[in-house]
Every structure is written in C-alpha cells, then in structure tokens.
C-alpha cells in the first residue's frame, strides 16, 4: 500500500496523475485529503487516517509519499506511524513560506516543538527524498543540506515544484519500499 498526500494545491489534476503513476509499483494507492489551511487539525486528521489505513491493510511494508507540503506531512506522519516515507520537494519550513496563504502558519512552529526531539536522527534511513533542481518555489539546496545527513537524496533535473511526472523515480521507490 502507498499512501499519497497532496501538496498545498489539493485540487491540482497532477495529484490524480501521480496516484496513477504510483499504481505501477503498487496497485493499492490511497489518497488522503486534508485541508492544508489548519495545521493542528490537519496533523490530528492525518495521524488518524494513516493509522486507520495501516491497520486495515495486510501490507507489511506500507509507504507514505508526499509532494511539497505533502512531503512535510509524509515525513512526520510516516515517522509517527512507523512506516517508510518518500518525499518530493518537501516544504520543510511551512511556518515561514505559508504565511499569507493559510490562517495560522504559526501552528507549524508549535507542531515542531511537539514532535519527537531529533526525530530525523531516529528516522534515518526510513525516508527517501527526491529534489528538483528546477523547483521554482523552494531552494532545494537548503533542503538537501538539512536532510542529507539522514536520508538518501535523489536529484531530478527536469521537474518543477509540483513534480507532475514521478515515473522516472518509481523503481527507486519500489526498491526502497521493499
């Protein structure tokens, strides 16, 4: 089973396309929707939904995947639920770069203080990070600097922030899932 978390643009047709691409490596892909506007509520909702999906599945190696803001959540929710994560162009600082787009960006700071201390050290090796060199929203060199001590980084030379086409990374994802 692969659990897919969309980014800030939850209505993007690219989400459906990514789900279809993910089905090439696992026919059981679950799309979990969340508001993107209310971080504390989103976290509670995502933990509950992802935990429920894991409990209902007979897959012993489920995977959670997200793009942008979905990558932020996939890393944290995957860690908290004990499953591997694949994150594409993750938004590591939504409290800063979501200001003006959501009602309470400061909630991300509060979420960060409630997370397990040094969770990336504890999560080392359980997350695969794919970063685009053409990300027009985030500086992915900063993302790589923050994550490369803990996770394998794959650089993509063609995609932009939304990562419409993930097919070139499916085999790496499949190998990582196993």
Swiss-Prot record:
Gene3D superfamilies: alpha/beta hydrolase. InterPro entries: AB_hydrolase_fold (IPR029058), UPF0227 (IPR022987), UPF0227/Esterase_YqiA (IPR008886). Transmembrane segments: none annotated. It comes from the Bacteria. HAMAP family: UPF0227 (MF_01047). PANTHER family: ESTERASE YQIA-RELATED (PTHR35602), UPF0227 PROTEIN YCFP (PTHR35602:SF2). Belongs to the UPF0227 family. NCBIfam families: PRK04940.1 (NF003431). This is UPF0227 protein PBPRA2397. The lineage of its organism: Bacteria, Pseudomonadati, Pseudomonadota, Gammaproteobacteria, Vibrionales.
């Amino acid at each position: 089973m692969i659990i897919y978390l969309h980014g800030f643009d939850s209505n993007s047709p690219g989400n459906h396309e990514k789900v279809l691409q993910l089905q090439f490596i696992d026919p059981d892909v679950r799309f979990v929707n969340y508001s993107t506007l209310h971080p504390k509520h989103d976290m509670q909702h995502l933990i509950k939904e992802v935990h429920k999906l894991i409990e209902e599945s007979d897959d012993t190696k489920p995977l959670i995947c997200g793009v942008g803001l979905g990558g932020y959540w996939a890393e944290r929710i995957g860690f908290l639920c004990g499953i591997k994560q694949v994150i594409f162009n993750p938004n590591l600082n939504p409290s800063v770069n979501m200001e003006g787009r959501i009602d309470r960006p400061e909630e991300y700071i509060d979420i960060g203080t409630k997370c397990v201390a040094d969770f990336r050290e504890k999560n080392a090796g359980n997350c695969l990070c794919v970063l685009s060199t053409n990300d027009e929203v985030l500086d992915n060199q900063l993302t790589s600097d923050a994550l490369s001590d803990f996770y394998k980084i794959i650089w993509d030379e063609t995609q932009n922030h939304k990562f419409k086409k993930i097919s070139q990374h499916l085999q790496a994802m499949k190998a990582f899932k196993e």
